[in-house]
Regions:
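Conserved small-residue-rich beta-alpha loop and adjacent elements
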Residues: 103-169
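A glycine- and small/hydrophobic-rich beta-loop-beta segment
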Residues: 258, 266-341
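Flexible, glycine/charged-enriched surface loops at secondary-structure junctions
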Residues: 98-103, 225, 262-267, 287-297, ...
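Short acidic-hydrophobic, aromatic-tinged amphipathic segments that line or gate anion-handling sites
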Residues: 1-7, 178-183, 303-308
Length: 432
């Protein structure tokens, strides 16, 4: 890890640089895979599964028998943990339901919104070094609460042609309708355009590597919506001298083990804490099964000391971390001054792992500084809000002249006329 002390503000941009995920140089490769899936459907997806995931599949769909077999393979303890997490995620997201109300902007002019679920959504769950069954819950539970009619899940199978049992169990618990064995670019293309087996969806959610990210970017240009721009995972710990270096080191390492391009940052007002955390990170790192991944990630990570808590907060808002852990004596007052972060974890007993799994908040969050403009996944991510307006005669008489004047000044005479003909009818005593 890189140790930095009292950086000048002019250095902040350089200090806060993240590992870059450049997807533009992948676009030609990704586009060729997408185009073939569009043209050949299942056959192309099956071929790419053999090429990229090294598995020959008879079909893409996961059968009911496979789901039942998977359920039998998941331990009762893990099932209970998944159900607990699902319950908490459900409770938190159900509380986000939108309740629209009618607003009278003028007498006779009434406006309102109605929340409507996105009918078909696609969830992408990566394979790789660890089964991300928690992400199934984070995406499928709010989709079901929102009322999405079709929830489609794609995930790469293992070399044995099977999906990890915990992923299948989480999908069942969360209410996923259909599951397919497809990963990478081909999975994104299948959900974006549809194949003989995989339904076309209207919005795609979920993390992935740089190829998945590039695929989502390309299909979102014109054909389907996506959740948000994605990048490597990241955490910042904002701490003072009261923080426990053991806890801080554990939190930094929990992020570092995600992947070699993850980033973990400490911003503190205490030199003593900076030094203690460095020692503790090295001690805990040696004990981790995923030590090699975490070790590479730590090369992107920094332990930064600043002069004051005000400066620490300003630097934090400039960084806009995906995950922010605040371990200070007055963490609630510090939290009030945070304006750029994906999800915030308050106090020494609130590890980022809680949000990753079971506190109830969503772990699908903006990375790469996008927390300055994007929110994490929530119930709103799975709905659209349609606006309605109703105008009665009294209302048209009030706002009609203003509309006519504004339309005339924008040289949109047909817009003006649409109001004028109605006002004329009202003057003649005929409002129909």
């Amino acid at each position: 890890m890189i140790l930095i002390s009292n950086p000048d503000k002019s250095q902040w941009q350089e200090i806060l640089k993240r590992p870059v995920m450049n997807t533009e140089n992948l676009f030609d490769t990704v586009r060729s895979v997408i185009d073939r899936v569009k043209e050949e459907g299942d056959r192309a997806v099956l071929d790419y599964e053999e090429k990229f995931d090294k598995v020959m599949l008879a079909s893409l769909a996961v059968s009911e028998e496979e789901q039942q077999e998977a359920e039998n393979l998941v331990s009762e303890d893990l099932k209970a943990a998944i159900r607990l997490a699902k319950q908490n995620i459900e409770t938190f997201h159900a509380a986000q339901r939108f309740e629209g109300k009618k607003v009278q902007t003028q007498p006779g002019v009434t406006c309102w919104q109605k929340a409507v679920a996105i009918e078909k959504v696609g969830l992408y769950i990566p394979g790789g070094t660890a089964p991300l069954f928690s992400t199934v819950l984070m995406l499928a539970v709010p989709a079901r609460i929102a009322g999405c009619k079709e929830i489609v899940l794609c995930t790469p199978p293992g070399r044995d042609g099977k999906v990890h049992p915990a992923v299948l169990f989480a999908a069942k618990v969360a209410g996923v309708n259909r599951i397919f064995k497809a990963g990478g670019i081909q999975a994104i293309a299948a959900m974006a355009y549809g194949t003989e087996s995989v339904p076309k969806v209207y919005k795609i959610f979920g993390p992935g590597n740089q190829y998945v990210t590039a695929a989502k970017q390309l299909v979102s240009l014109r054909d389907v919506a996506i959740d948000m721009p994605a990048g490597p995972s990241e955490v910042e710990v904002l701490a003072d001298e009261t923080a426990n270096p053991i806890f801080v080191a554990a939190d930094l390492l929990s992020q570092a083990e995600h992947g070699v391009d993850s980033q973990a940052i400490l911003i503190t007002t205490s030199v003593e804490l900076q030094q203690a955390v460095k020692v503790e990170v090295e001690r805990q790192l040696a004990l981790l099964p995923r030590k090699e991944i975490a070790e590479k990630s730590l090369a992107n990570s920094k332990l930064i000391v600043v002069d004051s808590m005000a400066e620490a907060i300003e630097l934090t808002n400039a960084y806009a971390p995906e995950h922010l852990i605040i371990e200070t004596e007055d963490y609630l007052s510090v939290a009030e001054r945070i304006v750029n972060a994906g999800s915030v974890f308050l106090g020494s007993l609130t590890p980022e792992s809680a949000g990753d799994y079971a506190s109830g908040t969503n772990h699908t969050l903006p990375t790469n500084g996008y927390a300055k403009a994007y929110s994490g996944v929530s119930l709103d991510s799975f709905i659209r809000k349609i606006t309605f307006q109703e105008i009665k005669p009294e209302g048209l008489n009030i706002i009609g002249p203003a509309i006519e004047l504004m339309a005339a000044n924008e040289q949109l005479d047909a817009h003006k006329n649409a109001v004028s003909v109605r006002l004329g009818q009202l003057e003649n005593g005929n409002g129909n």
